[in-house]
């Protein structure tokens, strides 16, 4: 499988147990997620989401638990829906027969937190345990609005998922701001993930490189130098 330095996509693809041919086909399918922002279309996103749910990774997952890959995929879908709230009930009707048990659809709707999410939730056949737990599930906006000082790996994943779903530069800029703020901090693992994912995305997608180029111009000289040093350190380590 071609090396893909995306925290978001790697978390999904790495778990796929498949032959080489199947692996390539599934990777091609999953690779449509981080490029969705180039041609956003909520119906295309729904169709892609349904196809992804049919891959072995998710068809074999009857645990009800959210792996990192499943978490990221659902965040992406939730953010697509969040940016297209008028599609909520269409997605709800389509996915009711695709997501079994419907507890997963309840989680998706809670992540999205659109005005009609509650209407969809009322129609779902979900366990009492899940229904009681739904108020504890944060929306994708809660993840993306997290203060830079307290962000962790899940927040980085949510920011990437949100950018892939919308193309909104603010999500990428927040990752760059996190790198600057934590350059001398005590969370090297999250900092490393942020640097690695940003550098990789900049190399793969010119749109992201352009966003960072413009963002650097808004920074004071000292912070601009910190960001550049953090990104350069990856190149010298290779």
Language-model region placement:
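Bacterial N-terminal signal peptides
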Residues: 7-15
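Non-catalytic all-alpha helical scaffold/repeat segments
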Residues: 21-238
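Bacterial N-terminal signal peptides that target proteins for export
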Residues: 1-6
